[in-house]
Amino acid sequence: MRYSHLFGKTSKNAPSDADSPNARLLEQGGFVEHVMAGVYSWLPLGLSVLRKVEQIVREEMDALGGQEIFMPSLQPKEYWMATKRWDSVDVLFKLKSQTDKEYALGCTHEEVVTPLARKFIRSYKELPFAVYQINTKFRDELRAKSGVLRGREFRMKDMYSFHADQADLEAFYAKAIEAYLRVFKRCGLDVKVVQAGGGVFTDKITHEFQALTESGEDVLIVCSKCSFGQNSEIATLKEGDDCPDCGGKLVKAKGIEVGNIFDLGTKYSDAFDFDFMTEDGKQRRILMGCYGIGTSRLVGAVVEAYNDANGIV
């Protein structure tokens, strides 16, 4: 194709409202076009990059044993009421139809995948299993910013795993960490796995995957010698302390969260009465895990990590 026929062109001038390198460079380079705060059109060049990133993610999730599905973004209010998150998730977009029926635009899919899995899974013989999707999510961000890093509409891969016992969940969780690290390595990012809070997802300690960059929004406490790290929001240690794992010195760093994983326990299976039959014929609550990667955010993180005065490198 001739460049003159390419839909979307590079520009000599940076967008005046760009507040981060990825916002400036992706739009100036003809990869995306800003529609409104937190919302972008992906042009042919940008869509090609996004698809490559999502294919890397898809390959690693398939290798982990995930089965790809596609779930709706439009979700019934009653599902969110069942988990008591209708009023507790402050970024949830809420809609009302012409018949006054209320819906949510999904920022996550625990409320959909749990009753879906409950319909098909009955026995320990069908466990463990994992399903994932790559689709569009929505967040009613109070202040969307930083280009494609913090959007109101964005692309995401979310995987959900189902297990008979805690040991099996923890084994899969560990494999998911390794799969995620392979994804980010293939994307060329220096990523640190850090302990973090569970927010509205779980009361347990979770893990974030932080791409280390000075332009990152998150403040981290990390070891200069080993893999130990904590998000400062839940940090039990501070800069200058000794690392509990290796004794090295802890330092502050900035990062962009590009992925997260959660041990959900029985929070959602309790909400939807999701049991399975054990080998000895008893009913037991199923255990769940959740694993997310923001694929459009990942594109932005790569640009933040690989740019200079001349543009994207």
Which residues does each predicted region cover?
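TRNA-recognition modules of translation machinery and tRNA-sensing kinases, especially anticodon-binding
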Residues: M1-V313
